[in-house]
Curated annotation (Swiss-Prot):
It comes from the Bacteria. Pfam families: PseudoU_synth_1. The active site is at D53. The gene is truA. It catalyses: uridine(38/39/40) in tRNA = pseudouridine(38/39/40) in tRNA. This is tRNA pseudouridine synthase A. GO terms for molecular function: RNA binding; tRNA pseudouridine(38-40) synthase activity. Substrate binds at Y111.
Length: 243
């Protein structure tokens, strides 16, 4: 038995998220597990570093699993890529120590969110659209308020009585890149849909519809009387996993 690490990228548009689901609902984890089991002739269960939601993409998702198969890993990755749909790629497959766990060994997760200010037929699978010119200076001011350890319940789909509400954000900043407005945010962990709720709130600030002071109150208190909405999944990428 050996422990394997897979580095994976995917276009999440046509998948119901990372995590396997019952029945025939297509998920990234379920698709890879099925093919891995087919190739190795053994039941394979993957552990992912991040549980991306329906429609969310990954530049670097990391998964780990235990395998009895002694197949050369370069051959295993090649076989997987030959069978996987073109929207999922195995970028790397390596042997790791038995105590490695893709989720629990991770110390930092980084997401990027890409925003176009005007609609684009070519980019709509991979961006959210603001339909407005944005004040990135205001959005950057709001992003700085997120850094640190906070209760992010107001920016998530977690139940209010969930015991694990606090996340430590190590960096959060907006910048312009190739005609897009891009958020990059890193933290030790994220609540469900947390990045998308934060993005929507900061976009509202960039449009002059949400005062930064109110946003700061929401971050510091963990509560909100403001109607929270999640930004579209299409613009969000799991960008990097740190170990």
């Amino acid at each position: 038995m050996r422990t394997i690490r897979l580095d994976i990228e995917y276009d999440g548009t046509d998948f119901a998220g990372w995590q396997r689901q019952s029945g025939t609902i297509p998920t990234v984890q379920g698709t890879i597990e099925k093919l891995l089991s087919q190739i190795t002739q053994e039941e394979v269960l993957l552990n992912g570093a991040g549980r991306t939601d329906k429609g969310v993409h990954a530049r670097q998702q990391v998964a780990s699993c235990a395998l009895h198969s002694s197949m050369e890993l370069s051959r295993l990755a090649h076989s997987l890529n030959c069978l996987l749909p073109p929207t999922i790629r195995i970028c790397n497959a390596v042997h790791v120590t038995d105590d490695f766990h893709a989720r629990f060994s991770a110390t930092e997760r980084t997401y990027r969110y890409f925003v176009s200010e005007t609609p684009s037929a070519l980019c709509n699978r991979f961006t959210g659209c603001a339909n407005a010119l944005l004040d990135v200076g205001v959005m950057q001011q709001m992003a700085a308020m997120v850094v640190g350890e906070h209760d992010f319940t107001a920016f998530s789909r977690e139940e209010r009585d969930s015991p694990a509400k606090r996340c430590k954000v190590t960096s959060c900043r907006w910048h312009r890149l190739h005609g897009m407005v891009v958020l990059q945010i890193s933290a030790n962990r994220f609540l469900r849909s947390m990045v998308r709720y934060l993005v929507h709130a900061m976009l509202q600030g960039g449009k002059g519809r949400l005062a930064p002071t109110l946003f700061q109150d929401m971050v510091e208190s963990g509560t909100s009387s403001y109607r929270m909405v999640a930004a579209p999944a299409s613009g969000l990428f799991l960008w990097r996993i740190g170990y």
